Regions:
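Short, charged, low-complexity loops and linkers
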Residues: 1-6
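Short, charge-rich amphipathic interface segments used for partner binding and complex assembly
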Residues: 7-17, 21-65
Length: 67
């Protein structure tokens, strides 16, 4: 697998961790600002995941992606 493809996979894995962190944070939040923070983490994770998956698809279409 190409190094850039490994980074894309790691990025997608990171977004899963970010979503888990947002879930955990929301479960224990003590004030509204924490909720805002975890909402930003969640939104960012979804956006990063979307970009990483689009890049993965581009690599697949170009024939670069080897698993």
């Amino acid at each position: 697998m190409r190094p850039c493809d490994k980074i894309i996979i790691q990025t997608i894995e990171l977004t899963r961790k970010m979503l888990d962190l947002a879930d955990e944070g929301e479960a224990v939040q003590e004030d509204r600002n924490c909720g805002v923070l975890y909402g930003v983490v969640r939104d960012s994770a979804y956006r990063i995941k979307q970009l990483a998956e689009a890049e993965k698809e581009a690599h697949i279409r170009k024939g670069w992606w080897k698993e």
